[in-house]
Amino acid sequence: MVRIGVFEPSTGDSGAGGKQEMLGMQYANKETPTVDIGGETYTVELVYADNGSDSSKAITAASELVSKDVSLVLGSYGSGVSIAAGPTFDEAGLAAIGVTCTNPQVTAGNDYYFRICFLDPFQGTVLANFAQEKFSARRLTCWASWATSMTR
């Protein structure tokens, strides 16, 4: 058995986004429920830990996955919780792969956290270029809540 940790919010402000990511992981697991390693076939089991969309809960959820002896971790939706949990995964030597956590700080200085998505600075540049080329825009206004990790 290969156990993959699912480090996602199923509750809190980002719960809806976390559930969408989990649906994708569940679909992939349903389509490919086994993996061949060194000539042996293993069943893949998803092990869930709700980080609650909260940095303090994220550390507890990360520790829970470490204690459940997962082989690697997928997640999370939301960079703030990924940044908070990063040291836990790093200290345990447990690889984590961020699916949509776009903040560069998620992987900075962490040999065990990786990502499969674009970084915030890249996305910002692409959007600015698009707005300028498509609409001749020269100014942009963003509204965001200072309380979210994306604006800090």
Question: What name fits each language-model region?
Answer:
Residues F7-S10, A49-G52, G75-G78, V99-T102, ...:
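Active-site-proximal beta-strand/loop segments in catalytic clefts of secreted hydrolases
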Residues N110:
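Short, charged loop segments at secondary-structure junctions
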Residues Q26-P33, Q132:
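Class I S-adenosyl-L-methionine
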Residues S10, Y113-R152:
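An alpha-beta-alpha
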Residues M1-V6, I37-T43, Q132-R139:
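Immediate post-signal peptide segment of exported/extracytoplasmic ligand-binding proteins
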Residues A16-E21, E31, V35-T107:
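Beta-alpha junction/loop-to-helix N-cap segments that form part of ligand/metal-binding clefts
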Residues K19-Q26, S55, T125, T151-R152:
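Short, surface-exposed alpha-helical segments at coil->helix boundaries
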Residues M1-M22, N29, S76, L140-T148:
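Short beta-strand segments enriched in small/hydrophobic residues
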